[in-house]
Amino acid sequence: MRIDRIAIAIKDAIEKRCFLPALAMSLIIPDICAKYDYPDIYYKKSKYKGHSGQGAAYAKWYDENIGNYDIDPITGIGILDGRSCWKLRCEFLHSGSIDLDDFMSVADKHITFKLISSQFSDLNYTIGGCSSVRYSKDKKNQDIELDIVNLCGKILAVLEESYLKDERFICETENKELNYIEYN
């Protein structure tokens, strides 16, 4: 299957305001790219932040391509890191859930994670709507609101600007059979 068809499908879903299918498709892109970029971690031959395997490779890919740069301008806090994005992927694709509150919370701080969409959740507004991190007045609680289209747009931007311009990546990923045929 041509990997660019996944990008087209995500954009089509967003255009039709079908954000959950767009999110599901977007969350598989880091899997594909991480397997290509970090095969040693993916196949458990080396580690990233003490972990190995598919999740560790996914987390490293997300951190290096998005997470390390996706900082809330007001609080200076990262919106989503690689481990949390991997957890979001697993919860959403395997359980139909986005409950990351317990996973993201630490001993002295409760974090509430929400996926959002708005009238500005559209790829025509650059990369999508607004995401934010807010603290409670006592700084013990934190709300993270992640715009679905914003996340999808960032993942798509990395795919389109890096990987879809890499002939070796295209050959390796398109060499796999998906047995998908579109009849018109």
Region locations from a protein language model:
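Flexible secondary-structure boundary motifs
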Residues: 28-79
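Long, charged low-complexity segments
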Residues: 60-169
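Short runs of predominantly hydrophobic/aromatic residues within well-ordered alpha helices
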Residues: 19-26, 30, 82-85
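Generic alpha-helical secondary structure signal
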Residues: 1-4, 8, 52, 56, ...
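Hydrophobic/aromatic-lined pockets within catalytic cores
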Residues: 15-18, 34-38, 93, 97, ...
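Charged alpha-helical initiation segments
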Residues: 1-23
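Sequence termini and other peripheral, non-core segments
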Residues: 165-184
